[in-house]
A protein has these predicted regions:
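Short loop/turn segments at connectors of secondary-structure elements within structured domains
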Residues: 6, 46-48, 96
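Short amphipathic alpha-helical segments
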Residues: 29-36, 75, 79-82, 86
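N-terminal catalytic cores of peptidoglycan-degrading enzymes
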Residues: 1-31
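Short, internal acidic amphipathic alpha-helical interface segments
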Residues: 22-63
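Short, intrinsically disordered, mixed-charge
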Residues: 38-46, 81-92
Length: 139
C-alpha cells in the first residue's frame, strides 16, 4: 500500500506477445477536466513504464505494457513499482484538481458536526481549508 492511496487495484494480463498492467487510480473527476487531464499528460512525459489514461467512463488509470521477452521478475517488479509510486504520488494532486468542491463541502460538513477531519488534512493548504475554526478540529 501507498501512503496517500492506500490500495491500488491492478489487473495484469498476459497475451502472446506482451504483459499488460492496468491500475485504477481514481474515478472520473467532478470538475476541472482540462486542468486534471493537462496535469496527467504533462506527468506522462516524466514517467517510467506506465502512463495515465482514461476508460470509457472517464475513470483514471495507469497503464503499461512489457514485451513478453522483458517480462522477467525484474521487469514485472519495475512496472509494478512504477504503478505504486505514480498512483501514490499522484493521488492527492488528482483529488485537488478534480474534486476540490467536493473536498471543501466534506470539510465544512465534518467541521460543522465535529466529525474527524484527519484524512483531509493533506488538502488544508492547497484548497485553502485553513480556517482557524476548522483547524482546531483536526484530529
Amino acid at each position: 500500500p501507498g501512503e496517500r492511496k492506500l490500495q491500488t487495484p491492478c489487473r495484469i494480463s498476459v497475451s502472446a506477445h506482451s504483459v499488460d498492467v492496468n491500475a485504477f487510480v481514481c474515478r472520473r473527476p467532478d470538475e476541472n477536466f482540462e486542468g486534471t487531464y493537462r496535469w496527467m499528460l504533462e506527468r506522462n512525459l516524466k514517467m517510467f513504464a506506465v502512463a495515465f489514461g482514461l476508460d470509457a467512463m472517464g475513470d483514471i488509470y495507469l497503464s503499461g505494457r512489457l514485451p513478453l521477452t522483458a517480462a522477467t521478475a525484474d521487469g514485472i517488479d519495475k512496472i509494478l513499482g512504477s504503478v505504486l509510486e505514480y498512483a501514490d504520488t499522484s493521488f492527492n494532486v488528482l483529488l485537488e484538481l478534480g474534486f476540490a468542491s467536493a473536498i471543501r463541502k466534506e470539510w465544512a460538513w465534518r467541521v460543522a458536526r465535529g466529525e474527524p477531519t484527519h484524512n483531509l488534512t493533506a488538502f488544508i493548504e492547497p484548497l485553502g481549508l485553513s480556517d482557524p475554526e476548522a483547524t482546531d478540529t483536526v484530529n
